[in-house]
């Protein structure tokens, strides 16, 4: 996964925006720097960056996904970044393992520490100490508890919240500073609990939205406009998995515990382990029976 970062430390950072370039009309400039044989997604990102669409960024942090994506970020760093207003803006890559082993966890921690946290601290003076990480995890956990409680309301026969409304709230928890949104999430939870639902449910059927990187709200709106109520989700940037509480003890290294949590709980099918490849399927069946 590649994400764009704006300055600060929320649950490791303040604002996160996924690499997107909607409504791209031309790849002319990007095709000059890349090949016209490379995928349109990568060229769209380069095109948008050169146009100035990412000028609000302080950093780009990504992973080694594919050669085309690596080339895309290299072009952003060399061609677009020098013209961005923030001259401290940096691009960094993390080599994230796709197998849950002791040695892969050590490698994961080393990558996040050296390629991400240390660079943030050196460039912007961001506090990445154990104390700061623990505080970030505490705020993260508060958000996760609230969003999970709201999400569970979708299981009711006559839910007080739509799948679209929940998708909006859940995306907010991924993008916005936790300390800023917590008061509003608490207010929203209280308001939803007090809602009076219609005597008859509005939907014609109940469905689960299953997939990979789904962060387009219009897709959720389209499904529910057709009369289907989205009562569960299982996709990247969704709530299950994704909004689980991170349990920390007082003895082990904080960053190691955080990395271990994500390495073990993620259900990315790109993992090399067979059990990880099968996890999304079994988890989907579990959610359906709920």
Predicted regions and their residues:
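Anionic-ligand anchoring segments at beta-strand to alpha-helix junctions in alpha/beta enzyme folds, i.e.
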Residues: 14-35
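Redox- and metal-dependent alpha/beta enzyme cores, enriched for Fe-S-associated oxidoreductases
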Residues: 17-18, 211-273, 277-280
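A charged, amphipathic alpha-helical module
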Residues: 109, 116-243
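Single conserved hydrophobic/aromatic residue that forms the stacking wall/gate
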Residues: 2-13, 285
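A short, hydrophobic C-terminal helix/tail in secreted or cell-surface proteins
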Residues: 288-290
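Acidic/His-rich segments in extracytoplasmic proteins that coordinate ligands and/or metal ions
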Residues: 43-119
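Glycine-rich, highly charged phosphate/nucleotide-binding loops
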Residues: 35-50, 271-280
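Gly/Ser/Thr-rich loops at beta-strand to alpha-helix junctions
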Residues: 1, 7, 63-70, 209-216
């Amino acid at each position: 996964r590649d994400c764009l970062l704006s300055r600060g430390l929320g649950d490791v950072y303040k604002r996160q925006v996924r690499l997107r370039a909607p409504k791209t009309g031309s790849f002319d400039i990007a095709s000059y720097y890349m090949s016209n044989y490379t995928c349109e997604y990568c060229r769209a990102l380069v095109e948008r960056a050169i146009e100035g669409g990412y000028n609000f960024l302080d950093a780009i942090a990504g992973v080694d996904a594919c050669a085309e994506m690596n080339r895309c970020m290299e072009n952003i760093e060399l061609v677009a970044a020098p013209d961005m207003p923030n001259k401290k803006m940096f691009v960094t890559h993390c080599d994230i393992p796709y197998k849950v082993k002791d040695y892969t966890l050590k490698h994961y921690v080393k990558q996040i520490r050296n390629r991400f946290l240390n660079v943030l601290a050196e460039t912007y003076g961001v506090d990445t100490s154990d104390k700061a990480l623990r505080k970030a995890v505490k705020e993260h956990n508060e958000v996760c508890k609230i969003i999970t409680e709201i999400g569970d309301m979708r299981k009711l026969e006559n839910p007080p919240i739509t799948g679209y409304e929940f998708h909006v709230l859940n995306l907010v928890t991924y993008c916005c500073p936790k300390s800023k949104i917590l008061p509003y999430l608490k207010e929203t939870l209280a308001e939803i609990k007090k809602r009076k639902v219609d005597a008859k449910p509005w939907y014609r059927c109940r469905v689960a939205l299953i997939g990979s990187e789904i962060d387009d709200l219009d897709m959720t709106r389209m499904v529910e406009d057709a009369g289907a109520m989205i009562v569960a989700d299982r996709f990247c940037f969704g709530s299950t998995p994704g909004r689980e509480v991170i349990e920390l003890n007082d003895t082990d290294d904080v960053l190691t515990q955080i990395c271990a949590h994500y390495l073990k709980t993620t259900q990315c099918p790109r993992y090399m382990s067979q059990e990880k490849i099968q996890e999304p399927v079994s988890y989907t069946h579990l959610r359906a029976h709920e």
